[in-house]
Amino acid sequence: MLKRTLFFGSPGRLFLEHSLLAYETRNANDASEKRTFPLEDLGFIILESLQLAVTTACLNALAKENIAVVVCDHAHMPSAMLQPFSGNTLAQRHTEAQLRATEALKARLWRQTVKAKITNQAECLKRLGLPDRRLRVLAESVKAGDSDNAEAVAARYYFQQLAGPEAFSRCRDGIPPNPALNYGYAILRAAVARALTGSGLLCVAGIHHSNQYNPFGLADDIMEPFRPFVDEMVFSSRDFFAVPELGKVQKAQLLQLLTADVISGTERRPLLNSISCTSASLVRCFLREETVVKYPEFVKK
């Protein structure tokens, strides 16, 4: 079942009521209004309003159900997320396998990750009517551990093609459509972290990204092949270029990405579900039950 995504952009209160998530706010007549949501139906929650109160009991329940909770800052951009300590009954077995992974295994997994990312970047360019052959050739040449830094070479060419004649450079604080890319990537990161935790893996122990100040190294690794899905949505719509700050309409569009269909293995499924499939296949790789991480691809047009 596809989990629901909820967006809370108005003042109010979130609390737990009879094992349901309850949202209480006031209407134009200052009368109290309340809505409830079954926790088992939820997969993703965005808390945007700075005047939103959330109870501790509510946060505990959301963490227990492994529901991704993203908190936004004063600029309405994602700034933090709720990370449960445990989300899988086999967590110890999976975590031990992850921590025992050899450098050779991690290098092989990173090669697969970079290859999948570049392949999806090439498909993104093709869908936008841009030249993609160079990236397809580059994807086939990625070495273990990406020792030749094919990821960076691909990124440079990729964003040059996406930008075209416009003076665009990819940076966190840059001009549009950077805000849309930042928002979309942050949503992806939270979704991937949720899936990894749900599979009993440690987000802090990456296969490539390793930084003592980054508790989401593995999420940053595994989300890489998913980035082109955000890119394709952003660069195919001029709405994300028009304004320096994202409005509710643009944010709603980006959140719809989680329900967009992709090809995962041999099946067509929503992106959010495919992230869980990728996470599960990564676990099997750590357990030495499989040798290839299953990343999603674009649905062919």
Task: Please state what every model-predicted region is.
Residues 1-35:
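N-terminal, Lys/Arg-enriched amphipathic/low-complexity engagement segments
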Residues 34-90:
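Glycine/small-residue-rich interface belts in oligomeric ring/scaffold proteins
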Residues 2-5, 11-12, 24, 64, ...:
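Active-site helix-to-loop segments that bind/position phosphate- or nucleotide-bearing substrates
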Residues 23, 30, 44-46, 54, ...:
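A broad, structure-centric signal for solvent-exposed, well-ordered loop/edge residues
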